[in-house]
Amino acid sequence: LAYSGLMENKEVTWMPAYGPEQRGGTANVTVIVSDERISSPILSKYDTAIILNQPSLAKFESKIKPGGTLIYDGYGIINPPTRKDIHVYRIDAMDEANERKMAKTFNMIILGGLLKIRPIVSTESILKALRKTLPERHHHLIPMNEEAIRIGMDIIKEE
């Protein structure tokens, strides 16, 4: 997503928190893609959040701006979001990826859902970024990733 934003000449920041959080906490990454200059990569409130598990929902649901967007995967959420002042979308990406025996494309299914409701960058930019960043030996996987993006666009549903 971030690389695709750069390819479209947008302002982009990418700030991961993948350290000790991976081992039992709420690993997260903040990506900002904007047509305007970004003053800080650190946010206290988010326009959009993609949430994949219950601990992350507990931590981040309250940090979405009123009128913002929350996308969640039904597989990892037992108690769905409760806020009424945000747009909530469910995408059953894990179930869909497993059903199609495409488990490694889970993230691309999620990305497809995001791009349907928030077309931050074009799908073509995503595919160009994959061609540019993936080693040549993995280029045969690009059509499967493109299919996963389309699946995500098809299965995301507003609640």
Language model segments and positions:
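Active-site cofactor/cluster-binding pocket
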Residues: 1-159
